[in-house]
UniProtKB/Swiss-Prot annotation:
PANTHER family: ORF PROTEIN-RELATED, U3 SMALL NUCLEOLAR RNA-ASSOCIATED PROTEIN 25 HOMOLOG. This is U3 small nucleolar RNA-associated protein 25. Belongs to the UTP25 family. It holds the Pfam family UTP25_NTPase-like. Residues 1-179 are annotated as: Disordered.
Length: 723
């Protein structure tokens, strides 16, 4: 059974998934790859394996009106005509030329008809065939690359091996004794930790016991980064300088340390994306260059006893986890801008299926919403990229790819198929750099997919996949790859689930660093013309597991009883307009059922909007709440994440729990000011939010870092009011 999307409502208009296209064997040569952006048969119908070519050609031939023999004769005639055209003098008779051209056009038409018919068949293929194509196990074509490398030896951007290069010290030639000692410390959970605060950013660095947990100097540019020669000029142009939070994080990124960054914004996302693209591309090129050099060396010194440990079990080395196809397009654009390939195979197909225009109706939406959902926001995708010296190939099979870019759902679907025999995650066995961007958005989709993927990284493969074990690095064979792998995660804010990744999955012997901002608090940045009373009520909760029950009890006995009295007593004065915001969907269902069945709320009219509510019901609930027919509206945080509607008619906001995203707090409190004539009255209703000691992370983002300490030290039942 395929894993659930778990992403709330149906996606926006641009987010529909394009039909899966099967590889077609019509165009088998590389002649059309010279101009990747030109419209060609090779772009629209990517090349496949020989067996697929023959099968597809036979299918097209069955549908054509001519027989197989006639097709063969037509093909022979076409070749003869080409030879004739080459041999014919340009000054020959015009009548003869017209006859040749007519025959040539006729043969071309036959082939074009076959392509069109093949395209119609491709559109009918199901997702299972796309999965099979992605996982098609081909032997890595290193021989082809090696021949190309040898033929272009003069142009090879060969770099001398530098012992100070983190790639050398961390991956290629680590000191065995030091590596063993650090792995033992990591497995024993013995870390040395240091902390510091700088420029509104709190840094926590941890290294295995025995190493010094000092902080690296800031990085203002890429001048001292050990980049491949091919990337040095382009990287300097794309990233002329490094500033802001990036200058504190870049040293750890290029040093192959694990990084958790919890202050991602729309403004700093672009420079961080370029830095990570440079790092990922640099790692791929260095890895491939080392393999190709050793291939040539092994071929020249066949009698020598060489110990060439330069590989993992499988070829893919970099994994990107991204929230949408458009996010994937942005990453690929950064990579191609740095790599500047002479050819980009299947680029047109990539843009056609992954990119889309922005929805102009979203101009009034917040910038973070537009960044996440603009363009093609489909969250079901996966893409393999293969690098050669001058080419990037899109839609490469995973086992011949150097880099995999995917959504958690798209990758989980291929790893966790209904048929146990088809499940496969061996292509993740040798991943050395993992980049998870916009992790907070991934959590709103389905965090279980992210967790599943991370737990299946760097496991021992079930099959050999053509691996030359004599060239596998020792720490792969010892099942220690997870301690050398680098994991980089960027998020707009830190949640307990993201913190769990830092604790459980970031086990790098080079160390790890976590960066979180110092928060001023969303309560001080409300979009209202008047001050509003904001009350935070703390309740006792013994454990995270018991927190939902304690929260529900406190809400029904303390908060809801007061609301019922206020609304009932003020019915003649048109009281109501109570918006109850509920972060968790499970809590939402529980509260909704209580409103529907409890005698306590029998006299209240209410509406409910969640991420699973049908659009027609959403419109009806909003309308009834705005005109007063519903005095209470239950509203889920995930719905707000996916839609960002402005709810009118709000006179009081009650937060069943503090929202994870601090921006949502300000936006929802801002609903009080949508009606300018009633803004003063709405401000009197104010805001009331419930919290427990387990809400410390999200409470800090709302009330601010300085206020958090006192609120966490007080006992349950205490109330904190801010104006």
């Amino acid at each position: 059974m395929a894993p659930p999307r778990g992403k709330g409502p149906k996606r926006h208009a641009k987010g529909s998934r394009a039909p899966v296209k099967r590889k077609n064997g019509f165009a088998t040569s590389r002649l059309d790859e010279v101009d990747s952006d030109a419209s060609s048969a090779a772009d629209e119908f990517p090349t496949g394996d020989l067996s697929e070519n023959e099968m597809d050609h036979e299918e097209a031939g069955d549908d054509a009106s001519d027989s197989e023999e006639e097709d063969l004769n037509a093909g022979q005639s076409y070749n003869e005509l080409l030879q004739l055209l080459q041999a014919t003098d340009s000054k020959g008779p015009a009548r003869k030329k017209r006859k040749v051209e007519h025959k040539e056009e006729k043969v071309k038409k036959l082939k074009t008809d076959a392509v069109v018919e093949g395209a119609e068949e491709e559109e009918k293929e199901e997702e299972e065939e796309a999965v099979a194509n992605d996982l098609e196990q081909q032997e890595p074509s290193d021989e082809e690359d090696a021949n190309l490398d040898e033929a272009n030896a003069d142009e090879q951007d060969s770099d001398t091996e530098d012992g100070t290069d983190p790639f050398e010290s961390h991956f290629a030639n680590p000191k065995e004794a030091d590596l063993t000692k650090k792995i033992q410390a990591v497995e024993a959970k013995k870390w040395t930790t240091a902390k510091k605060e700088t420029e509104g950013l709190r840094l926590v660095r941890s290294v295995p016991e025995g190493a010094e947990a000092s902080f690296l100097p800031t990085m203002k540019s890429l001048a001292n980064v050990k980049l491949k020669r091919k990337l040095q000029t382009t990287a300097k142009d794309a990233i002329p300088s490094i500033s802001g939070h990036a200058q504190h994080l870049a040293p750890y990124v290029f040093d192959y340390q694990d990084v958790l960054y919890g202050a991602r914004t729309t403004s700093n996302a672009v420079p961080m994306r370029d830095i990570l693209a440079a790092h990922a591309t640099n790692h791929v090129l260095k890895t491939r260059d080392r393999v190709l050099k050793n291939n040539l060396r092994a071929a020249k010194e066949q009698d020598a006893d060489l110990d060439l440990r330069d590989q993992g079990f499988t070829r893919p080395k970099v994994l990107y986890l991204l929230p949408s196809k458009q996010a994937c397009v942005r990453v690929v654009e950064s990579i191609t801008r740095l790599f500047q390939p002479e050819q980009q195979e299947n680029k047109k197909r990539f843009l056609d299926t992954f990119s889309a225009e922005d929805d102009v109706s979203w101009d009034n939406k917040p910038d973070d919403f537009r960044e996440l959902f603009a363009g093609n926001n489909d969250d079901m995708f996966r893409l393999g990229l293969k690098f050669t010296r001058k080419t990037i190939k899109f839609f490469a099979q995973f086992y011949t790819s150097d880099m995999i870019l995917a959504s958690p759902l798209g990758l989980r679907t291929i790893m966790d198929q209904a048929d146990a025999k088809k499940r496969d995650h061996d292509f993740l066995s040798s991943i050395e750099v993992v980049i998870v961007d916009h992790a907070d958005a991934l959590q709103m989709q389905n965090w279980d997919h992210v967790d599943y993927i991370l737990k299946h990284l760097n496991l021992q493969p079930k099959e050999a996949h053509g691996c030359d074990f004599s060239r596998v690095r020792p720490w792969y064979l010892d099942n220690q790859a997870r301690h050398v792998r680098q994991l980089i995660m960027l998020a707009g804010f830190i949640t307990p689930e993201i913190n769990s990744v830092y604790s459980a999955q970031m086990q790098n012997v080079a160390g790890k660093v976590k960066a979180t901002p110092v928060y001023e608090g969303a309560i001080s940045e409300l979009p209202l013309p008047v001050s509003v009373k904001q009350t935070f009520s703390r309740f006792d909760s013994l454990s995270p597991a018991k927190d939902p029950d304690a929260r529900f009890k406190h809400f029904t006995t303390t908060v809801l009883s007061t609301l019922v009295r206020q609304i009932t007593a003020g019915r003649g004065k048109h009281r109501g307009g109570v918006l109850i915001v509920i972060p968790s969907y499970l809590d939402f269902v529980r509260v909704r059922n209580h409103f529907a069945t409890s005698a306590q709320t029998a006299n209240l009219s209410f509406g409910a909007i969640s991420e699973y509510t049908e659009p027609r019901e959403v419109a009806r609930a909003r309308s009834h709440f705005m005109n007063g027919r519903h005095s209470v509206l239950l509203y889920s945080e995930r719905f707000h994440h996916f839609r960002r509607y402005q709810i009118r008619g709000v006179r009081q906001v009650v937060m069943y729990g503090v929202p994870e995203n601090p921006r949502f707090y300000g936006e929802m409190v801002g609903f009080l000011g949508l009606d300018a004539a009633a803004v003063v009255e709405a401000a009197e209703g104010g805001v009331r939010a419930l919290f427990s000691k387990w809400d410390a992370l999200k409470l800090e983002r709302v009330v601010g870092t300085k206020r958090l300490g006192n609120m966490m030290r007080e006992r349950g039942g205490d109330t904190f009011t801010f104006v």
